[in-house]
Structure formats: C-alpha cells, structure tokens
Amino acid sequence: MEFENNIPIYIQVINQIKKDIITGKLPMGAKLPSTRELAVLYHINPNTAGRVYKEMELQNMCYTKRGLGTFVTEDAAVFKALRESMAQEFISNFI
C-alpha cells in the first residue's frame, strides 16, 4: 500500500480496512490480523498498528476479546453507518 504524505498512516490503514469491511472482504465477525501481523502486512510500525485497532474500537468498527484477538463488529447499525459514510466520502471526492 502506498501512503499519502498529507494523511496520517493510521487513518489510511483504517480507511483501507473500512473498504475491506464494506466490500465483504472482511465479513462481520471476522478475525482481524494481530497487531504484529497488521504491522507486517502494511509495512508500518507495531505502535501504529496498535493505534489503528484502538481508533477502530473507539468507532465501534471492531472489538477485542482478551486472548482471542480482534474481530470486525457484528453490529449491523455500525456496518450500515460505515457504508453510508464511505458513500458520502466517495460522492464528495467525486464532486
């Protein structure tokens, strides 16, 4: 993934994961990579990967089960809100 200089890396990674959730590549309830795996996958610092999951949890996009990992939210309302916000973002970028 190529990162843009004017947007923080953690936000760009969150946006990519949002796209994966919306398109079904990451279905609701799917297990996300560990923090270290995410860091390797995106070639980012493990602290940045940790921040990605922390911010996603604050936005209710995912949840963590101690000892089991981090999972995509199963809340349909959150999923719908993600789709709507991504659609709005796409429309505003297009116009």
Regions found by a protein language model. Give the residues of each.
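HTH-adjacent hinge/linker in prokaryotic transcriptional regulators
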Residues: L58-I95
